[in-house]
A protein has these predicted regions:
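Cytoplasmic membrane-interface "Motif A"-like loop-to-helix N-cap segments
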Residues: 68-83, 138
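Glycine-rich segments within core transmembrane alpha-helices of 12-TM secondary carriers
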Residues: 56, 141-167, 213-216, 240
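Symmetry-related core transmembrane helices of the 12-TM Major Facilitator Superfamily/SLC fold
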Residues: 106, 178-186, 231-240
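C-terminal ends and interior cores of transmembrane alpha-helices
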Residues: 78-100, 105
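Short amphipathic helix-loop junctions that connect adjacent transmembrane helices
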Residues: 26-48, 167
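Hydrophobic core of transmembrane alpha-helices in multi-pass small-molecule transporters
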Residues: 17, 86, 100-122
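Central cavity-lining transmembrane alpha-helices of secondary-active solute carriers
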Residues: 47-68, 84, 156-157
Length: 240
């Protein structure tokens, strides 16, 4: 597949695989993370998700402009570093349902979008530049096929990796993921903050948890621990 291709293609394709793996791992769990950790409904979560994607697709315009004034390679390297910092910040477990944690998250998303803008389009230009040499010009189309295949390889393993990291974190606390529990736990904690625990929701949490083999001795403690553990698992997924 790489036979007779310039050696730089190996490096650029591998970088593309790694970047897309991290990006799609994050996207696979991002909405669930927002809803679990902060108790956002689907509308608010969707707005944050859409805003992030808008930045991701807008920033390459800035990245291309900077590359013309700086250089493609410097933009790519800087983009990798900025993205790494952004993912590292997202991987750090912070308090659930707090304004401070949300501010940290939004800062991390800004870093990731900026890094992606510096990295993504400029990496493709670097691939194309490898084939300006007449020796390799006839292989340009096959090179980009390999390059885009690298995207799919990274994306293919992302969802299962995110799920595995979440399950590891949950299993360490003898918890099991259930799609209903994050919302119910947040609703119950909201009712506590409002001054009166919602007994009906508490009963639902207890029933679902018991059916899954989880022990609930105190609903408030269980709900808090469940959200904290699930959020930590998602954070681990961001750091992969």
């Amino acid at each position: 597949m790489f036979k007779n291709q310039p050696k730089g293609l190996y490096v650029l394709a591998l970088a593309n695989t790694g970047e897309r793996f991290g990006y799609y791992t994050m996207l696979a769990i991002f909405l669930l993370f927002l809803q679990a950790k902060f108790g956002f409904d689907s509308a608010v979560s969707g707005q944050i998700y859409a805003g992030f994607l808008a930045l991701v697709y807008f920033m390459p315009m800035i990245g291309g402009w900077l590359a013309d004034k700086w250089s493609f390679s410097k933009c790519v390297v800087t983009g990798v570093i900025v993205m790494f910092i952004g993912y590292l910040v997202m991987a750090l477990p912070t308090g659930i349902r707090s304004t401070g944690s949300l501010a940290i998250l939004l800062g991390a998303l800004a870093l990731i979008s900026i890094g992606t803008g510096l990295f993504k389009g400029n990496l493709q230009v670097m691939v194309g530049d490898l084939y300006n040499d007449p020796k390799y010009s006839s292989m340009r189309d096959s090179a980009f096929s390999i390059f885009y295949m690298a995207i799919n390889i990274g994306a293919m393993f992302a969802p299962m990796t995110a799920t595995a990291m979440t399950n590891i974190a949950m299993g360490a606390q003898d918890l099991v993921y259930n799609g209903q529990l994050p919302s119910l736990c947040n609703q119950y904690l909201d009712s506590i903050q409002a001054g009166a625990a919602n007994a009906e929701i508490g009963a639902q949490i207890t029933a679902i948890a018991s059916e899954a083999g989880m022990l609930v001795s105190d609903v408030t403690d269980f709900a808090t621990n469940y959200i904290e553990t699930l959020s930590t698992g998602y954070s681990y997924g961001f750091g992969v």
